[in-house]
UniProtKB/Swiss-Prot annotation:
GO biological process: maturation of SSU-rRNA
Entries under Pfam families matching the protein: RBFA
Function: One of several proteins that assist in the late maturation steps of the functional core of the 30S ribosomal subunit. Associates with free 30S ribosomal subunits (but not with 30S subunits that are part of 70S ribosomes or polysomes). Required for efficient processing of 16S rRNA. May interact with the 5'-terminal helix region of 16S rRNA.
InterPro entries (UniProt xref): KH_dom-like_a/b (IPR015946), RbfA (IPR000238), RbfA_dom_sf (IPR023799), Ribosome-bd_factorA_CS (IPR020053)
Signal peptide: none
Protein name per the record: Ribosome-binding factor A
Length: 123
């Protein structure tokens, strides 16, 4: 694994820990997952993809809460991870988990319909 990937994974772990144990913002949903962190090669910026299970309002509130806590999170990362530069953090909403769950649901429904509509003469 190359250095940038290792740093991205370490930052991902630390941000997850900070969100779970340090942030007390009531806007944050209980079901926030950090799905991916992409750090630029110069280590100046980190794009953090978060998945929030809940309504659109809960997603928007959670994203706002994370954005307002970005400075605190950056400071904590600076204390926990030894880097020359602590990356500036940008949060982005990631809907891939919900899309995956929706596609799985569609596949299951289609599969159930196909089983129910099988003609006994076809077997």
């Amino acid at each position: 694994m190359e250095r940038i990937e290792r740093i991205s994974e370490e930052i991902k772990r630390e941000i997850s820990d900070i969100i779970q144990n340090e942030l007390k913002d009531p806007r944050l949903s209980k079901l926030i997952s950090i799905t991916e962190v992409n750090v630029t090669k110069d280590l100046r910026y980190a794009k953090v993809y978060v998945s929030v299970m809940g309504s659109e309002e809960e997603k928007a509130n959670s994203l706002e809460g994370l954005k307002s806590a970005a400075g605190f999170i950056r400071r904590e990362i600076g204390r926990r991870v030894q880097l020359r530069y602590t990356p500036e953090i940008h949060f982005e909403l990631d809907n891939s988990i919900e899309r995956g769950a929706y596609i799985t649901k569609l596949i299951n429904e289609t599969s159930a319909q196909n089983k129910g509509s099988k003609d006994p003469e076809d077997t």
